[in-house]
Design a protein with these regions (language model features):
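Charged, glycine-rich active-site and insertion segments that engage polyanionic ligands
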Residues: 2-66, 88, 123, 161-163, ...
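Conserved alpha-helical scaffold flanking the Walker A/P-loop in AAA+ ATPase domains
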Residues: 34-39, 110-133, 139-143, 147-150, ...
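Short metal-coordination and nucleic-acid-contact micro-motifs, chiefly zinc-binding Cys/His arrays
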Residues: 45, 76-79, 132
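A short hydrophobic beta-strand->loop->alpha-helix junction that borders the nucleotide-binding pocket
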Residues: 50-51, 99-104
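Post-Walker A helix-loop "phosphate-sensing" segment adjacent to the P-loop in P-loop NTPases
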Residues: 66-78, 89
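Short cysteine clusters
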Residues: 80-86
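Iron-sulfur (Fe-S) cluster-binding segments and ferredoxin-like electron-carrier domains
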Residues: 87-98
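Structural recognition of the conserved hydrophobic beta-strand(s) that form the central parallel beta-sheet
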Residues: 134-137, 152, 163-170
Length: 369
């Protein structure tokens, strides 16, 4: 599934200024917008935007950069959307915006890139705007390795007044303490359903697709947009449910053949598949506790999920969901793919089918290798 970089919010052609680069385009609370404005005008310390994948870091960083580069910014709304700087940024690039990210064929930013693109250009005056902005990706543990972070320390500490830094990360604790101490961190939390709905409305998707994306988004705008724009998402979800709903009646051989084959075929969608499986289990747990089906993530599958609940009275969806989360963590730590997925499928079969499960086999409260 494509990552979330920047989904431009389109304004109606009313003759009004283009607000797609302003803080207005960010679906968030007023308090959060005040934080962003403060980081632009009042506190010019290097900014560290921390938020999980899909939280909108790139989108927000671009609006912050636009405000810093703008010739006529508004102190509460950010970029004007009309000046030469804003018009250049709307084309997709800008002479005074330096974006540092891993090359397409690599997962890490080479330390040479940090030295040449940051330290090597630090003293060059801006060409169009009053400032120059460096947006640096340090998303994953290996995106900006220790040597690259060390090369960034002096520029963060000593730079001309026209230079501003924005660093993006999913986990600030993975960064060197010296990077964190030189930065001001803003944490990007999950959005409310209304805020996600506003973002989805601007994609022009049909209500059914947008509704499903909203329920699966879990407060993450990037997740919602990726799902709403992926024509295969509903098909993948339905194929996953066919496998999931058959697990209680399946054999061990089924799990190790057809079940494992499905996960190998869809390996690129693993993160999404695990979220989908967890959503099925969440819904089953709600039904098991007598909750209103209208509150299900997969509300369109309510009848099928209800049938599963009735057929396996001894099912333990809570323990099954813990196994799915544990599997995600193990795979993120590079556990063997086939072994880990097979173990999960066998465990789900047992937990969802109400079969006896030896405690020593599936210790869902502990990690495994």
């Amino acid at each position: 599934m494509p990552g979330f970089k920047d989904q431009a919010h389109q304004e109606e052609n009313t003759g009004q200024p283009d607000r797609s680069l302003s803080f207005h385009a960010i679906a968030c609370s007023g308090e959060f917008k005040e934080q962003l404005a403060h980081s632009v005008w009042e506190d010019k310390t290097p900014l560290l935007l921390a938020g999980e994948e899909g939280s909108g870091k790139h989108f927000i960083a671009r609006r912050l950069a636009a405000a810093i580069l703008c010739h006529q910014p508004d102190r509460s709304e950010g970029a004007c959307g009309q000046c030469a700087s804003c018009r250049m940024l709307q084309t997709g690039s800008h002479l005074d915006l330096v974006e540092i990210a891993p090359p397409d064929d690599k997962s890490s930013i080479p330390v040479a890139s940090v030295r040449s693109q940051v330290a090597g250009t630090l003293q060059i005056y801006p060409q169009l705007s009053p400032n120059r902005v460096y947006v640096i990706e340090a998303l994953k543990a290996d995106t900006l390795k220790e040597q690259g972070q060390n090369a960034l320390l002096k520029p963060l500490e000593e730079h001309p007044g026209f230079v501003r830094f924005i660093i993006l990360t999913e986990d600030a604790d993975r960064l060197l303490s010296t990077i964190r101490s030189r930065s001001r961190m803003i944490r990007i939390g999950r959005r409310s359903p209304d805020q996600i709905r506003r973002i989805l409305e601007e994609t022009g998707r049909d209500d059914q697709t947008a509704g499903l994306a909203l329920r699966y988004a879990d407060g993450l705008p990037g997740q919602a947009l990726a799902m709403a724009q992926d024509a295969n998402f509903r098909l993948l979800r339905d194929k996953a449910f066919t496998l999931f709903s058959g697990l209680p009646r399946s054999t061990r051989t089924d799990c190790l053949t057809a079940g494992l084959a499905f996960f190998k075929e869809e390996r690129k969608e693993l993160t999404l598949l695990l979220r989908v499986f967890e959503s099925f289990l969440r819904d089953l747990l709600l039904l098991q506790n007598g909750m209103d089906p209208a509150g299900l993530v997969n509300v369109d599958l309510a009848d099928d999920l209800g049938g599963m609940r009735r057929q396996a009275a001894g099912a333990d969806p809570a323990r099954a969901a813990e196994l799915v989360r544990q599997t995600a963590g193990a795979l993120a730590s590079n556990a063997n793919y086939d072994h880990t997925v097979a173990r999960m499928l066998l465990g789900l079969r047992a937990f969802m089918g109400g079969h006896p499960v030896p405690e020593q086999v599936f210790r869902t409260k502990e990690s495994f290798h």
